[in-house]
Structures are given as structure tokens and as C-alpha cells.
Amino acid sequence: MLDAAAERFRLLAEPTRLRLLNELEAADEIPVGELAERAGVGLSNTSKHLHQLERAGLVGRRRVGTTILYRVADPVIPQLCEIVCASLRRRYAALAEQA
């Protein structure tokens, strides 16, 4: 189980993937082109990262006509990101008070 957790954290340790997940969470469902634009990432790079996230079960997709819409598949992932960000905000605030 710890190896699987380490693999999940490895996937989440890449800033581009976190940006994509953040944009997916904000948009609910979104086509890859729009996601790439919102995240400021190239289309091929976005597709590569989405494929990795989808294989890990973190991102899902569905087809609507000729469009494929992507979404966050595991609701725990945005919560995990928020926990880490809140921890960092507290840490930075404490460091600022010490300065």
C-alpha cells in the first residue's frame, strides 16, 4: 500500500499536473484544448499528463459527440492539495512572523 501511495505522490509532485488538476476542479468538466489554455500548458504536454493521471485513476473522461471532456475522478485529490496548501500558508505565515 505504501508503494502505491508513493506512486500517487510522485504523480502529484509535478507542478504541471497540479495546475491541470486545479483547473479541472474549478471547471468541473472541460475539453483538453480549453484545459491546456487555462493552465498555460501546451496541448501535447497537457494530453501526456492527462494520460498519466487517467491511468492512475485521478482523472476521468467522457465523450460528448466529438468532444472529450475531462474531470477529476477522485474527489480526495483536490482535498489533499488544499490540505498541503493550507499547511504551506501556515508555515509561511509563521516564518514571516519570525522575520
Regions found by a protein language model. Name each.
Residues M1-A4, A26, D74-A99:
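Amphipathic alpha-helical dimerization/coiled-coil segments
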Residues L21, L50-H51:
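Short, hydrophobic-biased segments on the C-terminal half of alpha helices
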Residues E34-L35, L43, H49, Y92-L95:
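Juxtamembrane helix-loop transition sites at the ends of transmembrane segments
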Residues L20, G57-V59:
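A short linear hydrophobic-aromatic micro-motif
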Residues D3-S44, V64-V76:
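N-terminal helix-turn-helix DNA-binding core of bacterial DNA-binding proteins
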Residues E37, K48, E54-R55:
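Alpha-helical residues within the helix-turn-helix
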